[in-house]
Curated annotation (Swiss-Prot):
Disulfide bond residue pairs: 116-194
Glycosylation, residue list: 17
Family assignment from sequence similarity: Belongs to the G-protein coupled receptor 1 family. Atypical chemokine receptor subfamily.
Function: Atypical chemokine receptor that controls chemokine levels and localization via high-affinity chemokine binding that is uncoupled from classic ligand-driven signal transduction cascades, resulting instead in chemokine sequestration, degradation, or transcytosis. Also known as interceptor (internalizing receptor) or chemokine-scavenging receptor or chemokine decoy receptor. Acts as a receptor for chemokines including CCL2, CCL3, CCL3L1, CCL4, CCL5, CCL7, CCL8, CCL11, CCL13, CCL17, CCL22, CCL23, CCL24, SCYA2/MCP-1, SCY3/MIP-1-alpha, SCYA5/RANTES and SCYA7/MCP-3.
Protein name: Atypical chemokine receptor 2
UniProt source species: Mus musculus
SUPFAM superfamilies, sorted: Family A G protein-coupled receptor-like
Keywords attached to this entry: Cell membrane, Disulfide bond, Endosome, G-protein coupled receptor, Glycoprotein, Inflammatory response, Membrane, Phosphoprotein, Receptor, Transducer, Transmembrane, Transmembrane helix
């Protein structure tokens, strides 16, 4: 099974081969015999497939719409659009793995060894990519607003493209354990499961991967977002540009939503690590953490459904893209043979109008920052 945070196919209680962080057993045989998790397993077989299916449907619809609208209606690839495109692709690849895990949890792994590795690796890469691209978007706004860096220059565009490539490469490197250790395993009753088998080093690997997720997947991105948006807020308060209040509310909302979606899950993982280290715990605590992990994991996975709303649909400019796209589709549906070049051209012109929003506030705010900076130097 995937080793990062992916849904664990519900194995028999006390399976010592399972090295996913979503384990239902303790590390020593004596405790395994005492702490039965049959109720937890039964709950997961019903709850998780339903949640994974909802995430698949909502995430697929939202991110596919985001991707199509950006590709069709965006007049030129601004920096934010590039990040949104990559975020949409990452989210789509992430939600594509959900049906596989839903079937695996409800029944068992039926897709063979090759897909076991592919789906696990695909899950892990895009799990981190989604978080990293959100962080990059906050960095992009920070550079554009606080440091008034014009992002349309070739040097800035090259830097952003390099950063996008680095995000994919870094996520791929983090997912190496999925490629190496994940494989299918057959239980005594002939049921197949897909998970990582670290052999005698399972405990060390599980703890390492959990702490890695806590650090790279939550703590560092959260601190970066707090720093970037705090500095953005200070600049907006000082310069008082048009749309300041809405921009500040959006900045605060982005940080709060990220925290609310990811903190419960990462806290539960951290407590599970302490449980495995025997810092505290008994069977009752183990049961509660198992239930909590299933719920908080589902909440965290829903990030791929919320990000299109937060980072795109709250933008006036994107809503204009969407309106132009829907107008073209409606016109094509009503009269498939009617030329729509004039309409498309006018839609693109309309989409290029300058509007203040969280996703494009930098373009207006950086100009105000530069103008006021020049006035201060005179």
């Amino acid at each position: 099974m995937p080793t990062v945070a992916s849904p664990l196919p519900l194995t028999t209680v006390g399976s010592e081969n399972s090295s996913s962080i979503y384990d239902y057993d303790y590390l020593d045989d004596m405790t395994i015999l005492v702490c039965r998790k049959d109720e937890v397993l039964s709950f997961g077989r019903v709850f998780l497939p339903v949640v994974y299916s909802l995430i698949f449907v909502l995430g697929l619809a939202g991110n596919l719409l985001l991707l199509v609208v950006l590709l069709h209606s965006a007049p030129r690839r601004r920096t934010m659009e590039l990040y949104l495109l990559n975020l949409a692709v990452s989210n789509l690849l992430f939600v594509v793995t959900m049906p596989f895990w839903a079937i695996s949890v409800a029944w068992h792994w039926v897709f063979g060894s090759f897909l076991c590795k592919v789906i696990s690796t695909l899950y892990s890469i895009n799990f981190y990519c989604g978080i990293f691209f959100i962080t990059c978007m906050s960095l992009d706004k920070y550079l554009e607003i606080v440091h008034a860096q014009p992002l349309h220059r070739p040097k800035a565009q090259f830097r952003n493209l390099l950063l996008i490539v680095m995000v994919w490469i870094t996520s791929l490197a983090i997912s190496v354990p999925e490629m190496v250790f994940v494989q299918i395993h057959q239980t005594l009753d002939g049921v197949w499961h897909c998970y990582a088998d670290f052999g005698g080093h399972a405990t060390i690997w599980k703890l390492y991967l959990r702490f890695q997720l806590n650090l790279l997947g939550f703590l560092l991105p959260l601190l970066a977002m707090i720093f970037f948006y705090s500095r953005i807020g200070c600049v907006l308060v000082r310069l008082r540009p048009p749309g300041q209040g809405r921009a500040l509310r959006m900045a605060a909302a982005l940080v709060i939503v990220f925290f609310m979606l990811w903190f419960p899950y990462n806290l539960t993982l951290f407590l599970h690590s302490l449980l495995d280290l025997h810092v505290f715990g008994n069977c009752e605590i183990s049961h509660r953490l198992d239930y909590t992990l299933q719920v908080t994991e589902s909440l965290a996975f829903s990030h791929c459904c919320f990000t299109p709303v937060l980072y795109a649909f709250c933008s006036h400019r994107f809503r204009r893209y969407l309106k132009a796209f829907l107008s073209v589709m409606l016109r094509w549906h009503q009269a498939p043979g009617t030329p729509s070049s004039n309409h498309s051209e006018s839609s693109r012109v309309t989409a290029q109008e300058d509007v203040v929003s969280m996703n494009d506030l930098g373009e207006r705010q950086s100009e105000d920052s530069l103008n006021k900076g020049e006035m201060g130097n005179t």
